[in-house]
């Protein structure tokens, strides 16, 4: 009897997760009114593939091009995303320069639990900023649950956030008049609550879309 109840609850949970994922997908799809090229960047195992799987709909294919196994592509409405691993040394990362052509926005993902690779994250992030100086950057500090945080407690933990910035070299810069804008969001991409259209992941895409729109209007003046 207990096994049947647990099985039923598991099915209900899976159905709810699927429903909320559909809602989240449609939310992101509705954001970008014009075609926008977005780069999903970060070192390997940061959570890029997990995020792409959360974003894509059943009708969207994610494929691996034959010329390089570290990139993949996805289209979600007007959002055209390239997912790129930025591993290796600085010299190797410079080879990614071509991917930044006609880039409208960047999603940079960090595994906050993988402390031993923060120096690699710092170097990758510095390379990204050196290759693209205009596009808005969303930074997703991912896997905060492994640090005992929710999005709310992470935002309130100023000491931890300051330490993260010191270790990774990543800081908020939200004034477009001062140059390239960067905004940090604290998330657990695998969490069911990450599908919420009011959660930090949704707010991250909404902010990115707003900054892309701002840049487009500024360029048209």
UniProtKB/Swiss-Prot annotation:
Gene Ontology cellular-component terms listed: endoplasmic reticulum membrane; ER to Golgi transport vesicle membrane; Golgi membrane
Topology class, membrane: Peripheral membrane protein
Record carries keyword Protein transport: yes
Extent of the signal sequence: none
Binding of GTP, residues: 48-55, 91-94, 151-154
Highest rank taxon of the organism: Eukaryota
SMART domains for the chain: ARF, SAR
KW Hydrolase (keyword) present: yes
EC number assigned by the record: 3.6.5.-
Family matches, as InterPro entries: P-loop_NTPase (IPR027417), Small_GTP-bd (IPR005225), Small_GTPase_ARF/SAR (IPR006689), Small_GTPase_SAR1 (IPR006687)
Molecular function as annotated in GO: GTP binding; GTPase activity
Enzyme class: hydrolase
Record's subcellular location: Cytoplasmic vesicle, COPII-coated vesicle membrane; Endoplasmic reticulum membrane; Golgi apparatus membrane
Reactions that this protein is recorded to catalyse: GTP + H2O = GDP + phosphate + H(+)
Keywords, in A-Z order: Cytoplasmic vesicle, Endoplasmic reticulum, ER-Golgi transport, Golgi apparatus, GTP-binding, Hydrolase, Membrane, Nucleotide-binding, Protein transport, Transport
Function: Small GTPase component of the coat protein complex II (COPII) which promotes the formation of transport vesicles from the endoplasmic reticulum (ER). The coat has two main functions, the physical deformation of the endoplasmic reticulum membrane into vesicles and the selection of cargo molecules. SAR1 controls the coat assembly in a stepwise manner. Activated SAR1-GTP binds to membranes first and recruits the SEC23/24 complex. These SEC23/24-SAR1 prebudding intermediates are then collected by the SEC13/31 complex as subunits polymerize to form coated transport vesicles.
Family: Belongs to the small GTPase superfamily. SAR1 family.
Protein name per its UniProtKB record: Small COPII coat GTPase SAR1
Primary gene name: SAR1
């Amino acid at each position: 009897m207990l096994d049947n109840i647990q099985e039923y609850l598991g099915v209900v949970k899976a159905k709810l997760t699927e429903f909320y994922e559909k809602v989240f997908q449609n939310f992101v799809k509705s954001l970008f009114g014009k075609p926008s090229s977005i780069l999903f960047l970060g070192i390997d195992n940061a959570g890029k593939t997990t995020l792409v799987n959360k974003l894509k709909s059943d009708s969207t294919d994610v494929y691996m091009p034959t010329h390089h196994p570290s990139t993949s592509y996805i289209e979600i409405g007007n959002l055209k995303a390239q997912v790129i691993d930025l591993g290796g040394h600085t010299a190797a990362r410079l080879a990614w320069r071509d991917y930044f052509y006609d880039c409208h926005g960047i999603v940079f993902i960090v595994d906050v639990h993988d402390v031993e690779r923060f120096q690699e994250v710092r170097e990758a992030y510095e390379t990204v900023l050196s290759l693209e100086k205009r596009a808005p950057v969303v930074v997703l500090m991912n896997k905060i649950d492994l640090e005992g945080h929710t999005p709310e407690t992470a935002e309130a933990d100023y000491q931890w956030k300051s330490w993260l910035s010191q270790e990774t070299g990543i800081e908020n810069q939200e004034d477009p008049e001062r140059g390239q804008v960067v905004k940090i969001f604290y998330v657990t991409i695998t969490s069911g609550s990450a599908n919420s259209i009011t959660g930090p992941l949704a707010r991250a895409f909404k902010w990115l879309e707003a900054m892309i729109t701002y840049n487009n209007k500024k360029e048209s003046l």
